[in-house]
Regions:
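Glycine-rich, aromatic-flanked loop segments that form ligand/cofactor-binding clefts
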Residues: 239, 244, 260, 302-303, ...
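An acidic-aromatic substrate-binding cleft motif
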Residues: 240-300, 304-308
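Active-site-adjacent "subsite" loops/lids of carbohydrate-active enzymes
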Residues: 268-273, 337-393, 404
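Active-site-proximal substrate-binding groove within the catalytic cores of carbohydrate-active enzymes
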Residues: 62, 223, 422-635, 650-660, ...
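Acidic-aromatic substrate-binding/catalytic surfaces of carbohydrate-active enzymes
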Residues: 36-125
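Acidic, contiguous internal or C-terminal segments within carbohydrate-active enzymes
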Residues: 33, 52, 115-173, 589-592
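The substrate-binding groove and active-site-proximal loops of carbohydrate-active enzymes
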Residues: 261-280, 307-322, 364-381, 404-419, ...
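Short Pro-Gly-centered flexible turn/kink motifs
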Residues: 45, 216-236, 651-664
Length: 667
């Protein structure tokens, strides 16, 4: 068995346990059957039935086996909206062949967890002769899944077809509401969730009628095919967020993983060029302090803006005569690899203008935002640059900073937009290196469906700033977390906290007001940061500025985070708005352990009252009492506290206190 397959088996076991009622659940066995004029897919979590009466395909019903509730979905399975002419509904397409029921394909080499799991799928070929369209529809259900995915592949048989929208959900769903304000937000209804699986999708609910569609700009050319997908999932009572997260962890490009790394921004460069000697030195400093002296696993060293010569467009500056060869060798010696910042639209400020001038001289496409990734020539160049970095230097992560337009079509492009091009680019890179880490930053927003392609997205706001009261570092922490609340908690409540770029830990020479720590607040920043559960763990740190105690605090928290990854991946927001100086934090739960991190952003003492059942969103059958204690050595003298899960508990917080509690079931 390969190492990758072993890790995915461990992941699958953990998912199965977490979907239980506080205990291990039996593995769902997927059943698929055709009986008379109906097709059914089912496991112990969910069942779906479609009608194929009179040779047409239509929804019939869905059943949630956790709650025993049924959702009648009589109606169309999809709708295609042409720019001219009538809407083409699934009811107007005729089956070309009998339905095919088969095993879902399994790929042990895939980076997507779902592709490692067995399952069943139903496939139907449909045709509309008047519109000269062929549709391949399939529904897929896998082991361990609490959701059913539908894929619709459209193939034009005539010269071209100009479509304005692809509608994959159009049904009456009582109690439905869009869960968020960002594009690509799912719809929820009681213990159900529904969505079109794309970050550019849009959903609307009016009088319980749910419609989810994806705009399309380019015409579909004769012989060309394109695939879109939707999902409908069942959840347990009170467990919608957690069971939606189970879906995300199955289907995301790569399951959650701790990814600890250095970032050169604010340290080596701040719009300045740096060189190989600088880069190797910082790798050695972090490697010695964290890996050799403190046994911390480092994953990567990310070299941000400053490694390239902006007058040549994504070529190394003269200070890197051998590219990343020596940097990669140094990183590998500490068990890590190099990572690279690239900006599809060209970056920022003066270097961006230099890159644009170079691009235009070489005939690359541009648009209002800068370089146009969707341009045919620039796309090929940018893709080949990325692949070259992977092949030559073993680059294991890309920070893609800025993706340009979301709705402009470049002449000659095969993509609807720069965002569409970025999605295809990431797919090509993952095909070459499945475990590649991709951080997609500026231009993103909290749609969970970015995670079908990228590993993490930007939290929103400025890189760093200051809010609230207290020292500069305390005000930076408040600002960081106020942006999470504003742009993610309020705009996209089902986006996983575990997949945000928060702009890391900052203690660096070029970081405004964060190049020193006179108030000794660095431990608060470290403990709050790792308490978020984010997998993208960035260190914007100048090594020489840290004391031995600072390194110790950082190492302890980093190791704690990795050791508790299976719990922290459940991280969700608790409490109020940091900008209002309200107590807030994060909580996460697994059957073996729970973690609560609370922060008081005020210079006054504050109490926070809540039950563990509410904070942890405990499923039925969970422990009734938890033993709570801090994991930090500095709190080692404190005794464990027994907290009944269902009772209101008062947490007393000192000014600016960050309280971390590990909670172990004691009954």
């Amino acid at each position: 068995m390969s190492h990758t397959s072993f890790l995915f088996r461990i992941w699958f076991l953990m998912v199965t346990i977490s979907l239980g009622r506080g205990q291990a659940a039996p593995l769902p066995t997927v059943q698929a059957a055709q009986k008379a004029d109906t097709i059914t897919l089912s496991n112990t979590a969910i069942s779906a039935t479609w009608s194929i009466r009179a040779g047409t395909l239509q929804w019939q019903s869905l059943t949630n086996h956790f709650t025993g509730t049924t959702l009648p979905l009589a109606g169309t399975v999809f709708e295609l909206v042409p720019r001219e002419g009538p809407v083409l509904r699934s009811s107007g397409f005729k089956m070309v062949t009998a339905p095919i029921i088969e095993d879902a394909p399994v790929s042990r080499d895939s980076s997507k967890a779902a592709n490692h799991l067995p399952g069943r799928q139903v496939r139907v070929e449909l045709e509309d002769t008047s519109a000269k369209l062929r549709i391949t529809w399939q529904a897929i259900l896998r082991e361990g899944a609490n959701y059913i995915r539908q894929e619709v592949t459209i193939r034009a048989l005539q010269p071209s077809l100009a479509l304005s929208q692809i509608v994959l959900i159009d049904a009456v769903v009582p109690g439905a509401a869009v869960a968020g304000h960002a594009k690509g937000s799912p719809v929820t209804a009681g213990t159900w969730f529904l969505a079109l699986e794309h970050p550019l999708s849009e959903c609307r609910v009016h009088a319980d009628r749910v419609s989810c569609w994806l705009p399309r700009e380019l015409p579909l050319q004769a012989g060309q095919s394109v695939t879109y997908s939707s999902v409908i999932g069942a959840t347990r009572a009170t467990q919608l967020r957690r069971d939606f997260l189970n879906y995300v962890e199955h289907e995301r490009a790569h399951p959650y993983r701790t990814f600890l790394h250095y970032n050169s921004w604010y340290d080596l460069g701040f719009f300045d060029r740096y060189n190989e000697q600088d880069a190797v030195a910082v790798v050695q400093s972090f490697g010695e302090q964290l890996t050799k002296l403190r046994a911390v696993k480092l994953d990567s060293f990310l070299f941000d803006d400053g490694w390239d010569d902006p007058t040549t467009l994504w070529k190394f500056n003269p200070g890197f005569a051998d590219g990343l060869t020596k940097v990669a060798q140094a990183a590998v010696s500490y068990g890590a690899a190099p990572g690279i910042w690239l900006s599809p639209w060209g970056g920022y400020d003066k270097p961006k203008q230099q890159r644009l001038a170079s691009a235009r001289a070489q005939g690359f496409e541009t648009n209002e935002g800068g370089l146009a990734l969707s341009g045919p020539k620039y796309y090929r160049y940018f893709r080949d640059t990325c692949l070259d970095l992977i092949e030559k230097y073993g680059v294991n992560q890309f920070k893609f900073d800025g993706t340009g337009n979301a709705n402009e079509v470049i002449k000659g492009s095969e993509f609807d937009s720069d965002f569409d091009a970025a999605i295809h680019l990431i797919g090509e890179l993952r095909a070459r290196k499945p475990d590649l880490y991709v951080n997609l930053t500026t231009g993103t927003y909290p749609s969970p469906f970015w995670l079908l392609y990228a590993d993490s997205i930007w939290r929103g706001g400025d890189d760093h700033s200051f809010a609230g009261v207290g020292s500069n570092r305390q005000r930076w922490i408040t600002y960081r977390d106020s942006q999470i609340y504003r742009w993610v908690v309020e705009e996209g409540p089902l986006f996983p906290m575990n997949s945000l770029m928060l702009h890391g830990l900052i203690f660096a020479r070029y970081a405004e007001r964060l190049g020193s720590d006179p108030g000794h607040d660095f431990p608060d920043e470290v403990h709050s940061y790792f308490g978020t559960g984010t997998q993208l763990q960035e260190m914007y740190i100048t090594p020489s500025l840290l004391s031995a105690d600072d390194w110790d605090v950082l190492a302890e928290a980093a190791k704690w985070s990795r050791a508790n990854a299976q719990t922290l991946k459940d991280s969700h927001w608790i409490g109020g708005d940091p900008a209002r100086l309200e107590v807030y934090g994060w909580a996460s739960w697994s059957p073996e352990k729970a973690i609560v991190t609370l922060r008081n952003p005020s210079d006054q003492r504050q109490d926070f009252t809540a039950s563990l059942a509410a904070l942890l969103e405990l499923p039925e059958g969970s422990a009734r009492v938890y033993a709570a204690r801090s994991p930090w050595k500095s709190d080692g003298a404190a005794q464990a506290l027994q907290i009944p899960a269902q009772e209101q508990h008062i947490f007393h917080l000192r000014p600016f206190q960050v309280l971390t509690l590990e909670l172990v079931p004691s009954s």
